[in-house]
Curated annotation (Swiss-Prot):
This is RNA-binding protein Hfq. One of its GO terms (molecular function) is RNA binding. InterPro entries: Hfq, LSM_dom_sf, Sm. One of its GO terms (cellular component) is cytosol. Residues 67-96 are annotated as: Disordered. Residues 72-87 have a biased composition (Low complexity). Pfam families: Hfq. Disulfide bonds: none annotated. Homohexamer. Belongs to the Hfq family. It comes from Pasteurella multocida (strain Pm70).
Length: 96
């Protein structure tokens, strides 16, 4: 489960921290708008004129009003590990 959230958490946290307005599209087509107040593994608390708790399993897409700069060191190390694995696999194939 941690691998699935390695991009999600820093992205949502950047949206929350920078108070970037977002449009959240649900799987049934409904569009919600507001700012991300908080989130956890299962829900996002969206703040507009009222607070709404939106279950993540109901979300299709999160669209920020402007671009977001999120930095994910764990994602970079995952990418490096992946590249090292690919290189090792390639070397093993050549040796065979």
């Amino acid at each position: 489960m941690a691998k699935g959230q390695s991009l999600q958490d820093p992205y949502l946290n950047a949206l929350r921290r920078e108070r970037i307005p977002v449009s959240i599209y649900l799987v049934n087509g409904i569009k919600l708008q507001g700012q991300i107040e908080s989130f956890d593994q299962f829900v996002i608390l969206l703040k507009n004129t009222v607070n709404q708790m939106v279950y993540k399993h109901a979300i299709s897409t999160v669209v920020p009003a402007r671009s977001v700069s999120h930095h994910n060191n764990s994602n970079n190390s995952n990418q490096q590990n992946y590249q090292q694995e690919q290189q090792t696999d390639s070397n093993v194939e050549k040796a065979e």
